[in-house]
UniProtKB/Swiss-Prot annotation:
Disulfide bonds: none annotated. GO terms for cellular component: condensin complex; dosage compensation complex; nuclear chromosome; nucleus; X chromosome. The keyword Nucleotide-binding applies. The gene is dpy-27. It comes from Caenorhabditis elegans. It comes from the Eukaryota. Component of the dosage compensation complex, which contains the mix-1/SMC2 and dpy-27/SMC4 heterodimer, and three non SMC subunits that probably regulate the complex: dpy-26, capg-1 and dpy-28. Within the complex, interacts with dpy-28, mix-1, dpy-26 and capg-1. Interacts with dpy-21. Interacts with dpy-28; the interaction is required for dpy-28 protein stability and dpy-28 association with the X chromosome. Interacts with smcl-1. Disruption phenotype: RNAi-mediated knockdown causes derepression of X chromosome linked genes in embryos and in larval stages L1 and L3. Leads to an increase of 'Lys-16' acetylation of histone H4 (H4K16ac) on hermaphrodite X chromosomes. In the TOR complex 2 mutant background rict-1, suppresses the growth delay and elevated body fat index. In a sex-1 mutant background, leads to high XX-specific embryonic lethality. This is Chromosome condensation protein dpy-27. Belongs to the SMC family. SMC4 subfamily.
Amino acid sequence: MQPFKRRALTSDDDRPYADTDSMPEVDLDVDRRRQYMEQLNIFDDVSSGAYMLELEAAENGVKYDEKEDLLNVQIPPKYEDQISDPDGNRMIILNIYVENFKSYAGKHILGPFHKNLTMILGPNGSGKSNVIDALLFVFGFKAGKIRTKKLSALINSGGNYESCSVTIMFQMVKDMPVENYDKYEVLTDNCVCITRTINRENNSKYRIDDKDASQKDVQELLLRAGIDMTHNRFLILQGEVEAIALMKPTSKNPNEEGMLEYIEDIVGTNRFVAPISKLMHRVSLLEHKSSQYGASVRRHEGHLKVFEKAMVIGMAYLNTFNNLNYLRGIRVKHNLCRYAETMRDAKMSLVTRTGELEENKDIMLEAKDEVRKKETHERSLNSIVTELENKRIDWQSKKNDWHARDAKRKQGLKSCTQDLGKLMKERDEARREKFEIETAPENARISKQNMQLEWDQLKEQENVCQRTATENLIKYDQKSSADRAKHDDLEKKLSDELLQSMRAKAELDVSESELKDMTIMMEQGQKRVDELKGTLQTMMAENIRDNTELNAVTTELQDRKLKFDKAVEKLPHLKSTEQLLRSKKYELDQEVIEASNTQEVTYRHQATAKLHELKEAGLFPGFKGRLGDLASIPIKFDTAISTVFFAQLDYHVVQTSDECRIGIGFCHEYKLPRTTFVFLDHLKDTDTSGMDSTMKFPAERLFDKIHCVNPEIRREFYFLIHDILVVDSLEEATRIDKKYPGRHRYCTLNGSILNRSGALTGGGKPTTGRIRNDNNPNMSGVKKVDLSKLRAAQEKHNHALEAHLKLQLKQEEIRADNGPIIKQLEIRKRELIMSTKEQKTRIAELKSSIAAHERRMVNYREVTVEDLDEKRAQIADLKRQVEESQKSSAKIKQQIEQYKRKMDRMFMELVQKNKDSIEQAKDRMGQLEQDIARQTAIIENNPSHLEQAEKKLSELEHMCLEKRSEADALAQLEVGEDVKGIDIINAQLQTSTASIDAQRARYTEAVAARREADAAYQTTVDNYNMVKQTYDELMRIIDDLENKTMADNAELDIIESAWMQPEKLYPPGKFVRYNDPDIAAKMTDGHVVLPYECISMIEPHREAYEEHEARMLEDDVFEDTANKICKLEKDVDKFRREFDNKGVRDYAMIVSLLMNEVTSAKKFSDKLKAHREKLNELRMARFNEFSEALAFLGTTTQMLYQLITNGGDASLKFVEEGKSTDPFDGGIKFSVRPAKKSWKLIENLSGGEKTLASLCFVFAMHHYRPTPLYVMDEIDAALDLNNVSLIANYIKHSERTRNAQFIIISLRNQMFEVGNRLLGIYKIDGKTYNIMVDPIAVEIKNRPILKIFEEEIKRREKLRRAEIEPEIDLSNGLSNVVIAPKRKQRRLEMLKLSDFGLDDDSDLPEFNRFPPATRRELSVEDSDEDDEPVRRRPRRQVEEEDEEDELIEEATPSPPPIVVQRRVRRSRH
């Protein structure tokens, strides 16, 4: 990755910081600083430069977050080795189980695999690679890596299979020492099986040891086992070896991987890349900003003078306004003193009038006391009348009580008849129960016999199936016999108690019924007929009174209904009128509000209002208005037209060019702001036919969205806008412009423009409100409305609405008052009608009853009090017997329950546990036992039940006879003569009525006397009111003076709050003074700091006002003050028109920007220093860690390549080593020097040489960070026989490879012959099969036969040697030729010859031995001094030595092939 370019940075010593002694430190955020710059129209080169740096970083693939804390970034620790188990344990693949996977139809077992080296061989197309695909499938690789488009294609297509699955059995093993290399210890507790299944719907499922799992769980398990799923170093497929050789030194884009990234990914230093990239970008930004902020300080110091003039004018306006406020305050204080003097005179006159008022008040109070006496007398008479009325009501109540008792006696007879009916029903029910009891024993015996027969059958089945439980059942019967006997006795006792309780309850019911009958009989008297006659007279009197009240209620109800109906009829009309009046009021209110607040509601040009005033005055009749106010547009397009045509919308429209000149003259005369006039006549000869064009445009035309009634104004809009099209975004505009290039102009909804040439304009802050929108079509904001007329109409309308509301309220009160009364009267009327009807019916019934009683009157015996007491005592004794019987029954039930629970527990313990196998038969037997017991109880208890039923029936018949006799007796009884009581009551009622009439006459006289006293009192009240009126007039004067005083005090409060401060010159702005204690919080909230220059220019008018004492001024002084006020008001108005209200704000903003640039320059300088230190720290850490790993990998790759190629060399170095400050810029260079050749980059080698060098690099990575599993697919395809043998022997015999499991697919004999296991793959009829071969086991099995073959071979070899002895001598002579040792060979201590199966080099021929390691001039290993690399010798010396090497190599013949073959054979042992 290329580093970012550094910007020039001003040094810390010569930064142009401004003098900041009088101002605090200012630190604006980015948005607020940008806002200040835009408002002041200052170009922000800091932000623009930073934006370019952001684009540059994005192009380089840096994901940058400005808020990220890069100084405290956490770098993850170094990677740990995948197989660093301290106990030497590792996970290996034991077996692979495949089912319907690819070419494997059905179930197959691949294995067992060897713990180190397993070779897979077979013909092309037989399915060797499917073994690796099965591994990748379980490991969770995607379909593309498994050579298919989708996972469901992995299912075998030869049969109708719905799914396929692969299971890998992993086994934890511990390697034995070297002498027992082939042996290992299996740790059975750590074995695991991973299964993955896929179906036709592409649904995949993982299982770990037959438990559902996720892919994440599988990958975590593999990672714990040491299989690196992140870098996939364990997997080397066809062609991937050469891919290493084709890698560039470093990647040029994120989609490819270079040698540097490949190594960093393995080493782990890639964790430094992202933080270093972010820090480099951050340093570039900080360098740019620190430099640019220093330059901004110098620029803003020059801007101060530009904004100072407007600030001075604003402060002059502030001082003039405060002087005016000061003089107004003095005038108000003068008025307050004058009002106080006038109020003293008024209060003295008030004292005189107060005495007269008190005198008249005493006279009025005496008259009022007389009225109160009359009222007291009136109330006393009224209370007497009320008391007499209450007495009459009491006598009436007694009369009603007498009638109620008579009705109760009638009810007694009715109750007696009902009781008789109930008793007869109970008697019939008892007869039916008796019949059932009589027939129950025979039915019970039949049922018992049938159930006993069934029980015997079930018992026989139970005995057959439950012989093992018989003894326990016998034990249970023996142990529970005593308790069962007690239980039966208690049940019998309980039955007796319940029978006794039932009898007592029956006697109690009979006694209570007799007591009730006796009470009813005792209440019967001998005066029944007299009582009925009295009731008849009372009922007739009530009937007359109710009829009279009914007539009065009917009359009042009709009158109130008439009033209520009229009110209800008027109210709807009144309410509709009210709605109209309120709507009109709302419209007037809105017009007043709109006229008053037009400037706040919408945008208005400062000259528009004045021009409208001139038009209304008749001075400027041709003025039409501001162009933006003469049309409207939907609010969606407001931003687009207001931003693009904001200047044109402020044009002021007139009719002719002469009126334009008149308007310009008015602007000069009244010093109005600069504006543009446009006249409509210039469009008469202009072709505007296109505004109504029917042509179809590729997007909406902005002109079509404008709503305008006046056709001339509409033409003016078209002349300015033409056919510009409006779209949502610039992307859409660009897309349409490509389709119709150069044909239209486009504008976006936020105000950006795409011209016909393709140039973009706009992009600034969007503007709104320059034209009316359709949501507020009546909002003009330009025409000055006569507020006085509007407010007068508003007040008049309010009075009309108030009068209407009073009328409506009166009608609603009539409705509200009469509505409830009408409902009450209607209810009362219905009650009286029902009462009169009932009274008529009752009168007829009473007359008939009186006649019947007079005919049937007979004598009967009365029930005495002694009889009642005797019956009550008998009932109490029966209740006591019932309670005692219930208590005894409850106690017996508790004992029965205890015995029952005891037997149940015994049964559960002894029997129930042994009967689970015959539960159904046992349940049925238990049910039958209960039914038999129930039938037995019916048979045994039948006599007692029958006796009870007969007794109950007899009792009920007896009670029926008694109740019938009683009812007959009551029916024949008649009330005797007893009218004396009712006569007395009637007499008392008449006496009470006469007394009430007399007292009412006296009460009427008292009312007349009270009214005369009221008239006299009213005369005194009138006199008092006349005096009070004079008193109130004085009070009104005083109140008026107090109100004026209050108003002036309020004006003083306004003056106190009206003092102008610099903060009020621009109300929308928020300011804070430099001495404010909360300045930091307010600055954070967006406040602008007021400069010291502004505050120092404030004149002390407020202090002078506060020191001025309140007093009356002399006339000439007061007049002079008034003149000064008039002059100052004109000056204030002049300043208001001339000064820019944003002047102080702009000056404060430029000062704040200046202080912010000073603060930012210091802040970014400090940040830059800290980030540079952090960047250098991370670069050094990355370089040190990577250099250490690179040195190891380079040395190991070189050593392996030298050993395997017998004279070759390899090197891994930085491309930019010694040329750049950042060696990572150029990447890693993999250079190789094959035997007898020159140095070349690996991509320039032949295919076999690339493969050999890449494999050395792969094995070097295994040395650096080993992994327990390697899967290789035909890595030897490009190698010759010799190199294949060397690679195979290295994999098998190296100590470094013994701690890993290799699964290799190969078609080369030299490779698979060294395998510890051979997995043969073959195909029959399109289906793949396999066979696993153990070469060692086969060799042991065939050893006797091989011994015979070897002896025969030796005999024949001896004969052959005798024939070709000359050739052998020649071969031995050639074997003594020694190849010159390679000079400057590096001594390698990390690998040993034992890795290749050799104890030392004495077993090798002399030409294959290691040269003495005495010369290391070209070594890249570190020296002992200061850990610095040894410098290379001069280029000329190296070239001379290379020439010597070439001469020696040319003079040295190659060894014969037989020597190499011998070395290979020796290395196998």
